[in-house]
Amino acid sequence: MSTIKLSLCLLIMLAVCCYEANASQICELVAHETISFLMKSEEELKKELEMYNAPPAAVEAKLEVKRCVDQMSNGDRLVVAETLVYIFLECGVKQWVETYYPEIDFYYDMN
């Protein structure tokens, strides 16, 4: 069941990022949230969520999915994060990626 939740989350992120009407206007916060969710620790994510004063049940639900994601190897999470960065580049946030993830530059040569 947890894999289904993760798959659904990733599909929703892809749909939001690549929907034609929003392609050039993707919110940098969505990109940050997505990559942070994959790569940060549970503790870092919890601190970030506290800034939004979300209901405890919502925070716990997100952390539960995070625990599922954290069962993936770091290498697998990096592959997913890099794939999402590629999608963000295609959706017009190249400047954001260059600013916050300068180490991920190998995708520029793919265009």
Curated annotation (Swiss-Prot):
Q: Where in the cell is it found?
A: Secreted
Question: Which region is the signal sequence?
Answer: 1-23
Any one GO CC term of this protein is: extracellular space
According to its UniProt record, where is this protein mainly located? secreted
Q: Which cysteines are joined by disulfide bonds?
A: none
The answer to keyword Signal applying to this record is: yes
In its miscellaneous comment, the UniProt entry states:
The heterodimer can bind non-polar steroids, cholesterol and a group of small proline-rich peptides.
Described function: Part of prostatein which is the major secretory glycoprotein of ventral prostate gland.
Q: What is this protein called?
A: Prostatic steroid-binding protein C1
| Organism of provenance | Rattus norvegicus (Rat)
Classification of source organism: Eukaryota, Metazoa, Chordata, Craniata, Vertebrata
